[in-house]
């Protein structure tokens, strides 16, 4: 997923895509084997990483954990960047998996977390990653997905672009569960932000499958020629032990999106 642009230049798209998927699978496997209970939620003290503290326009605090690239800037003119949600829980596993594979050491991982002492800050992620909720059901507070996207687009991305030379054709978003749902929402509503979205066990069932409305609008815009989906991709992963309906939801979404491959979207 990180190497689609480079893959086309090398005329080896299948090989490069498999390599990219292998890197991400290695990171996910490391995460699952370690378990959330052992995930690092402390201050980042990992070799080859740094940490930033940032605020959104509304004053919400974020802890940004960055896995630094190794070596010279790639021949593409910039480093591939992966934005990783739920950074407190997942950053150490992804950072270790990246450094263990030589071909991906030039990537930058930007993990978005919170200044809390727990791997998963359920109240913050419930707000940041979700659609608006009815007032009587809005506990914990939800509905901050567009504000969170604003923070990423208007504050975090400019800082990353200032700190590193970024290959703008190699910007990815990775999220799990609610994070996967959020990643798909980002693709449907702001397809220009990320070239690649990886949604691991996405919560497609949430709010009576609220994403269907955004999917229909996205598909309509694509067929009308309003979107440039060249080199855009959506990769959805589910485990074979998940609920059958959750697996089926992912398969059906993939089938529906196949009609957009004519416009460049890979799913």
Model feature map: region roles:
Residues 10-11:
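Intrinsic-disorder-associated, low-complexity terminal segments enriched in Asp/Asn/His/Tyr and depleted
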Residues 26-35:
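Bacterial N-terminal signal peptides
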Residues 37-41:
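Sec/Tat signal peptide C-region and signal peptidase I cleavage site
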Residues 42-267:
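Non-catalytic cap/lid and distal C-terminal segments of serine-dependent acyl enzymes
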